[in-house]
UniProtKB/Swiss-Prot annotation:
Component of the ribosome, a large ribonucleoprotein complex responsible for the synthesis of proteins in the cell. The small ribosomal subunit (SSU) binds messenger RNAs (mRNAs) and translates the encoded message by selecting cognate aminoacyl-transfer RNA (tRNA) molecules. The large subunit (LSU) contains the ribosomal catalytic site termed the peptidyl transferase center (PTC), which catalyzes the formation of peptide bonds, thereby polymerizing the amino acids delivered by tRNAs into a polypeptide chain. Present with 29000 molecules/cell in log phase SD medium. There are 2 genes for eS19 in yeast. This is Small ribosomal subunit protein eS19A. It is found in: Cytoplasm. It comes from Saccharomyces cerevisiae (strain ATCC 204508 / S288c). Its main location: cytoplasm.
Amino acid sequence: MPGVSVRDVAAQDFINAYASFLQRQGKLEVPGYVDIVKTSSGNEMPPQDAEGWFYKRAASVARHIYMRKQVGVGKLNKLYGGAKSRGVRPYKHIDASGSINRKVLQALEKIGIVEISPKGGRRISENGQRDLDRIAAQTLEEDE
């Protein structure tokens, strides 16, 4: 379908499709500690999907960067952070792990989806935009 972009597809459908594409492709470099690490200091437990959560985070980050001009690690930490349960005290926002978001960006950069922006942060590359649009078109065709 010509003219289909990531904006035309529901976010969850696209993220699941792109995560499965990245997992099938096997080029994304996954750190060895992903099965035991928490994604934020505010979380009590690591993700339940020990095998595929890194691919879903990578797909989500790629979509997030696609929707904006450029994004840095700090903005991703704030985006993927959440509320920390502090017992009887009120909840408080805690940023996500910067190491995980940095490793995701480095892995996406290594396979050519994102590139370093001269203004700071990362932006989507031409090849990355083409790949994401292609996956979005396939996802839209499957939904119809």
